[in-house]
Amino acid sequence: MVQHELAAEIARQILLGFDDYREHFRLITEGARARFEQAQWQEAQRASAARISLYEEKVGETRRRLLASFDHADLLQVEAWPQIKSAYIELINPRFDDELSETWYNSIFCGLFSHDCISDGTMFIHTTRPAVRAHERLAQTRRYRPNGDLRGMLEQILRDYAFSVPYCDLPGDLQRLQTQLCETLPDWVCKDPELTVEVFVSVLYRNKGAYLIGRIFTCDEQWPLAIPLLHRDGQGIVADALITDEAEVSIIFSFTRSYFMVEVPIPAEFVGFLKRILPGKHIAELYSSIGFYKHGKSEFYRALIDHLANTDDRFVMAPGVRGMVMTVFTLPGFNTVFKLIKDRFSPIKSVNRANVIEKYRLVKSVDRVGRMADTQEFADFRFPKAKFEPECLAELLEVAPSTVEVQGDTVLVRHCWTERRMTPLNLYLENASEQQVREALEDYGLAIKQLAAANIFPGDMLLKNFGVTRHGRVVFYDYDEISFLTEVNFRHIPPPRYPEDEMASEPWYSVGPNDVFPEEFPRFLFADLGQRRLFASLHGELYDADYWKGLQDAIRQGKVIDVFPYRRKADRN
């Protein structure tokens, strides 16, 4: 058994690594304000990617330092880790980010030991943190009362959150915000003498936007509040909208968006605040939305094992067309799919396992523009065999035997990704009304365009590779063929040399590995002729190679597009 002093020193070194990670995380996040004020959009993209990769970098550094600092016979003695865990708990008890430090400890442990060594005695499978914290702390929100003057209250809010760059048209912004506030809330609310607006003290930054997040409440009711702010380069700051609809605010925090940059000294308190105004959001998703995606993964896992322990739910194959590269299963009562790489791919697929892993990891670091589902990667999941429907387990063992193994009463899944479950677009269209079909196809085209403008080409754009969220948004979720748009060679189909060319089974022109012919999209994407014609009327430019080349030129010139995670009331330039 490791001596108490040695256990305490190992725990201290683990926490020092966490402090180093948190400091670098804070510095990157803190720079978001200056990047917004200076309209440094490409720098913002680089900072976002750097912050995502920071966690694994710092875990690796800490692991190497531990291995260099301690005798391996002591450090790698798994029986000693309950004592190390106890020493660590004592160290993190006074912290404001204690729940994150538990996840950090877990990452270090998993970097030193195989998953066979995982237990609640050696790791924080279940949190030891109290639901209610007793820390004394500074207020995390600011409160405002209109006292009959809504415009004056809104002006005070905007002035309290002013930037080094002035507002472009403050009177116009105030008029717009007041109008939207009165239009979206019941008449009596704006006249209620108890009306209060509470705004989180830190501004949230993402891509080209900044957001004030809070709530509006009376004695009996509350509404979420989001005020998006834009920086029009050369013009100033614009308060673009005032949003109180829960579904719309929820979309701003969607699993399809990049992570916010926001200074949160007490993460649990901010997440609790978000949970109060967005009760439909899971804690895991909220932690991920503000950049703590590893802790989001911890919260997801805890929710999953709790669901399995307390329900009769059993794993089944996910609905939809079977994939050529991935196999997908799900729990009907748990809004998630589990994706495994098959042992053998369809012959028409030119990717390999390493390519697929690379593509899925790429999605984590790029701007998803609200059109790609976030993923979490897991290794060595263990589930009770009784939790699988026999048909599901049989199919998994058939198509992914190197990944799925039955060990007695347990099923070992060596590697998988989790994603939010959505309705596959092809299945959605089968049961949709005429209006729903039109709206879905319009959003499908917008999804492709917005991904392309963010330098992402989906590769396989078949309807089955897109899903429809509970808010009706179309989202791409099959990443094995994605690439950067600038890597693709878009071409027009050359005219046939002879009339017989058009009847031949093989093309009369050469095709390179990165060549894409948009004129071929209609027959590949739509078997339904009505849908094919409708999509052509909505997004016909997607069939033109010159459209794609124009996007490539804009990207190479360093242009960063505006993609708004909310409905804009009017177009304001």
Curated annotation (Swiss-Prot):
Record carries keyword ATP-binding: yes
Compartments, as annotated in UniProt: Cytoplasm
- Any idea which positions bind ATP? 318-324, 339
Source species, domain of life: Bacteria
Query: One GO CC annotation, please?
Result: cytoplasm
Gene Ontology terms for molecular function: [isocitrate dehydrogenase (NADP+)] kinase activity; AMP binding; ATP binding; phosphoprotein phosphatase activity; protein serine/threonine kinase activity
Enzyme Commission number(s):
2.7.11.5, 3.1.3.-
User: Keyword annotations for this protein?
Assistant: ATP-binding, Cytoplasm, Glyoxylate bypass, Hydrolase, Kinase, Nucleotide-binding, Protein phosphatase, Serine/threonine-protein kinase, Transferase, Tricarboxylic acid cycle
Catalytic activity field? L-seryl-[isocitrate dehydrogenase] + ATP = O-phospho-L-seryl-[isocitrate dehydrogenase] + ADP + H(+)
What InterPro entries does the database record attribute to this sequence? AceK_kinase, AceK_regulatory, Isocitrate_DH_AceK
Which Gene Ontology BP terms does the record give? glucose metabolic process; glyoxylate cycle; tricarboxylic acid cycle
According to its UniProt record, which residues of this chain constitute the active site? 374
Q: Does the keyword Calcium apply?
A: no
Query: What is stated as this protein's family in its record?
Result: Belongs to the AceK family.
Q: What does this protein do?
A: Bifunctional enzyme which can phosphorylate or dephosphorylate isocitrate dehydrogenase (IDH) on a specific serine residue. This is a regulatory mechanism which enables bacteria to bypass the Krebs cycle via the glyoxylate shunt in response to the source of carbon. When bacteria are grown on glucose, IDH is fully active and unphosphorylated, but when grown on acetate or ethanol, the activity of IDH declines drastically concomitant with its phosphorylation.
Could you tell me which PANTHER family the record lists for this protein? ISOCITRATE DEHYDROGENASE KINASE_PHOSPHATASE, PTHR39559
Protein name (database record): Isocitrate dehydrogenase kinase/phosphatase
Q: By which gene is this protein encoded?
A: aceK
